[in-house]
Amino acid sequence: MAARVCCQLDPARDVLCLRPVGAESRGRPVSGPFGALPSPSSSAVPADHGAHLSLRGLPVCAFSSAGPCALRFTSARRMETTVNAHQVLPKVLHKRTLGLSAMSTTDLEAYFKDCVFKDWEELGEEIRLKVFVLGGCRHNFFTSA
């Protein structure tokens, strides 16, 4: 299974934040074992995009303070191809989860610009919301009603 997530870099904490992105808005808040999720206006998802946050299809670790596991990280536009061809990002996120030294925020920004944003710019994408697929995690998945 995989989940659609929006990526946001938080330079204040030097962490990479992954936020769940729902495929459609149902007009009602979704809550889980960690409480209600923030409203779209306070999330990484622009309010005018129409996306909402949802627990559906997300692994338990997605809501951990240490961040989600990331064994596979792909562009939603190219589901069949891993964004990180050299398997760099999963190792970086795993090191951060363990509290080990990893890429700096500047290095991560450069990584995403080179590996992700460049592809979208070349494809002429107008929507700048970056949606990724996080998968390969061994944790259990939520299935919201």
Swiss-Prot record:
Organism for this UniProt entry: Hepatitis B virus genotype C subtype ad (isolate Japan/S-179/1988) (HBV-C)
Subunit comment for this entry?
Answer: May form homodimer. May interact with host CEBPA, CFLAR, CREB1, DDB1, E4F1, HBXIP, HSPD1/HSP60, NFKBIA, POLR2E and SMAD4. Interacts with host SMC5-SMC6 complex and induces its degradation. Interacts with host TRPC4AP; leading to prevent ubiquitination of TRPC4AP. Interacts with host PLSCR1; this interaction promotes ubiquitination and degradation of HBx and impairs HBx-mediated cell proliferation.
Locations listed in the record: Host cytoplasm; Host nucleus; Host mitochondrion
- Single biological process term from Gene Ontology: symbiont-mediated activation of host NF-kappaB cascade
Q: What is the lineage of its organism?
A: Viruses, Riboviria, Pararnavirae, Artverviricota, Revtraviricetes
* Database matches in InterPro entries: Transactivation_prot_X
Question: This chain belongs to which protein, by name?
Answer: Protein X
Has keyword Transcription? yes
**What does the function comment of this entry state?**
Multifunctional protein that plays a role in silencing host antiviral defenses and promoting viral transcription. Does not seem to be essential for HBV infection. May be directly involved in development of cirrhosis and liver cancer (hepatocellular carcinoma). Most of cytosolic activities involve modulation of cytosolic calcium. The effect on apoptosis is controversial depending on the cell types in which the studies have been conducted. May induce apoptosis by localizing in mitochondria and causing loss of mitochondrial membrane potential.
Which GO cellular component terms are attached?
Answer: host cell mitochondrion; host cell nucleus
Q: What are the disulfide bonds?
A: none
Q: How is it modified after translation?
A: A fraction may be phosphorylated in insect cells and HepG2 cells, a human hepatoblastoma cell line. Phosphorylated in vitro by host protein kinase C or mitogen-activated protein kinase. N-acetylated in insect cells.
Q: Do the record's keywords include Transcription regulation?
A: yes
Q: Where is this region: Mitochondrial targeting sequence?
A: 68-117
Which keywords does UniProt give here?
Activation of host NF-kappa-B by virus, Activator, Apoptosis, Host cytoplasm, Host G2/M cell cycle arrest by virus, Host mitochondrion, Host nucleus, Host-virus interaction, Modulation of host cell cycle by virus, Transcription, Transcription regulation
Q: What family is this protein classified in? A: Belongs to the orthohepadnavirus protein X family.
Which Pfam families does the protein's record reference? X (PF00739)
